[in-house]
Amino acid sequence: KDASAKPELIYALTDFHALTGFRPRKAVRATFERMLSQSLTPASLDVLGAIIGALKSFSESKALSRAVEIILSDPRTPGLVDEVAVHGLDELPAGHISRSGSAVDPAQTFCELVTDYPHDPGALVGLMLNRVPLQPGEALTMDAGVLHAYLFGTGIEIMASSDNVVRGGLTSKHVDIEQLSAITDFHSGAPRVVEPDRA
């Protein structure tokens, strides 16, 4: 809508959970590979194979970008979401690589997302993002282009003056895949949490 960037900060007033920025590619790939043990239809296995293939084949940022494009553009993805929701993901111990970058097992995040947004491909995109818990008084900062979603809790959101909103799923509104791919920062990295000064 306008040329302004939109960095944001969320300040937690209550216990708060957010998804923000991408987890390491190996962790994301391991999360999707967990789905291979399920009884999936050939169509869902094809989509899952394309996602995992993209995560293996390119540099990290290109791999994450390509995987998001596949998830959001393949018309068979809602079927994969539904099948994984029915079968569930087995919970794994905290040290498992698929849990890297997530405060909880990604299986829990997926269950929460499909409960609120059934059939939505964004539930799979959510598995690719860092899950960050905030305590009251903590804040999370995000540069422009960092994909994020707020899961629960109450907070104060502060952002630069901009009308720009590009969605990556978890919505009934239009998802502009081309625009999302053009402006999203697909580099993985640890979220920037700011703790309150206790002085």
Task: List where the protein language model places each region.
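Active-site region of the double-stranded beta-helix
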Residues: 1-138, 148-199
